[in-house]
């Protein structure tokens, strides 16, 4: 029996080998108790404020929207220590690991941001850290690999399968099944077996809580829409969670359209996948005709994931949130636009959400609308990728 509901509608669950069930039970129990423990909450809040730098700013983009009637704000998770929203929930889970008496942390990472956040939390809290990363991602995210190693983490390249995030996830789970007595698997997104989707949402929900308080202070009303990119879905569920009951606020998640949905080279399982079981959960995923997990693709390593968190699947199924896709080229254009108009270099992941906001503004420039984009991370890690693409195009 679980203490919390392991499902969101029909999505979610705990599809793991029997050997891992005690570890998941222990984790759920520790989480439920920690949520009620004022000491744990005070320590977590203190780390978020004095180590990570919360609350993050809500920035009005005046140049981007000039000549339109839209007000566009960015929730600046890029300003968080570590460079992205990942730091929030990693600090929470690392504290939970210590509470459970674990001495080691296992993690998987795609863009490297979760790996960096895990490495910094482990350095801070005195935990051993090993990070599994697809060999392809090790190549395309070399600055983050070095940052992890600088902070004492062991980075393990994964050469199996497509050598990307899904393979790193598989290896991390395999490791944990043999080491869970001393190690905590610090999962990096709001997906996977219960209780991870719930834990990650709760340890990210301050994004939406702060946004709501800040926008009410600045504008005196709630936004018409909040937008966030969706890979596994942690930054998006962190933004959406506090707005779910505010039905006047549209929740818009942006999946990576890659080279175009029709090309098959994308990472948009919510709208273009089939229901299946993978990574310990039941959720939409990209599958071949015979039910094998298909490789996802995105210009941004952090969105390159073949499935999606179960709460997003549920919000999509009941029509509470809308999910759309943005191609590599559209994300790249938004990346350049923000750099040149506001002096902010966004992560390629976040650029997908920004691109859809810009589409909305362009479609109805005379419409008075108040939009908030979750700028989930900064783009320092992506400058080499963008440089190579722009060089090939002759733009630099």
UniProtKB/Swiss-Prot annotation:
GO terms for cellular component: cytoplasm. It holds the Pfam family PALP. Its cofactor is pyridoxal 5'-phosphate. Pathway: Amino-acid biosynthesis; L-tryptophan biosynthesis; L-tryptophan from chorismate: step 5/5. It comes from the Bacteria. The keyword Amino-acid biosynthesis applies. It catalyses: (1S,2R)-1-C-(indol-3-yl)glycerol 3-phosphate + L-serine = D-glyceraldehyde 3-phosphate + L-tryptophan + H2O. The keyword Amino-acid biosynthesis applies. PROSITE patterns: TRP_SYNTHASE_BETA. Keywords: Amino-acid biosynthesis, Aromatic amino acid biosynthesis, Lyase, Pyridoxal phosphate, Tryptophan biosynthesis. GO terms for molecular function: tryptophan synthase activity. Its EC number is 4.2.1.20. SUPFAM superfamilies: Tryptophan synthase beta subunit-like PLP-dependent enzymes. The modification N6-(pyridoxal phosphate)lysine is found at residue 86. CDD domains: Trp-synth_B. Tetramer of two alpha and two beta chains. HAMAP family: Trp_synth_beta. The beta subunit is responsible for the synthesis of L-tryptophan from indole and L-serine. Belongs to the TrpB family. This is Tryptophan synthase beta chain. It comes from Pectobacterium carotovorum subsp. carotovorum (strain PC1). The gene is trpB.
């Amino acid at each position: 029996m679980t203490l919390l509901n392991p499902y969101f509608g029909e999505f979610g669950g705990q599809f793991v080998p029997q050997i891992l069930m005690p570890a998941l039970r222990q984790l759920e129990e520790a989480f439920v108790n920690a949520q009620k423990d004022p000491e744990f909450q005070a320590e977590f809040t203190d780390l978020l404020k004095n180590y990570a730098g919360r609350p993050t700013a809500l920035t009005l983009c005046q140049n981007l929207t000039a000549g339109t009637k839209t007000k566009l704000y960015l929730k600046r998770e890029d300003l968080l220590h570590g460079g992205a929203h990942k730091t929030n929930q990693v600090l929470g889970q690392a504290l939970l690991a210590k509470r459970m008496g674990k001495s080691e942390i296992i993690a998987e990472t795609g863009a490297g941001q979760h790996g960096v956040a895990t490495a910094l939390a482990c350095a801070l809290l005195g935990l051993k850290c090993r990070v599994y990363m697809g060999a392809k991602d090790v190549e395309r995210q070399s600055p983050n690999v070095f940052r992890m190693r600088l902070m004492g983490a062991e980075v393990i390249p994964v050469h199996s399968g497509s050598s990307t995030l899904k393979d790193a996830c598989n290896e991390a789970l395999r490791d944990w099944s043999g080491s869970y007595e001393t190690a905590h698997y610090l999962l990096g997104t709001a997906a996977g077996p219960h209780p991870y989707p719930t834990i990650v949402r709760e340890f990210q929900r301050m994004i939406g809580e702060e946004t709501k308080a800040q926008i009410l202070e600045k504008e005196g009303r709630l936004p018409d829409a909040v937008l966030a990119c969706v890979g596994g879905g942690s930054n998006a569920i962190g933004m959406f969670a506090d707005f779910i009951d505010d039905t006047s606020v549209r929740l818009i998640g942006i999946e990576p359209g890659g080279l175009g949905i029709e090309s098959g080279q994308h990472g948009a399982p919510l709208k273009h996948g089939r229901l299946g079981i993978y990574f310990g959960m039941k959720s939409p995923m990209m599958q071949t005709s015979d039910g094998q997990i298909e490789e996802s693709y995105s210009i941004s390593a952090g969105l390159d994931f073949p499935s999606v968190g179960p709460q997003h699947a549920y919000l999509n199924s009941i029509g509470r949130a809308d999910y759309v896709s943005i191609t590599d080229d559209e994300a790249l254009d938004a990346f350049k636009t923000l750099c040149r108009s506001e002096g902010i270099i966004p992560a390629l992941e976040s650029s997908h959400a920004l691109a859809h906001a810009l589409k909305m503004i362009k479609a109805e420039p005379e419409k008075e609308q108040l939009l908030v984009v979750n700028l989930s991370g900064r783009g320092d890690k992506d400058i080499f990728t963008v440089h190579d693409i722009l060089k090939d195009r002759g733009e630099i």
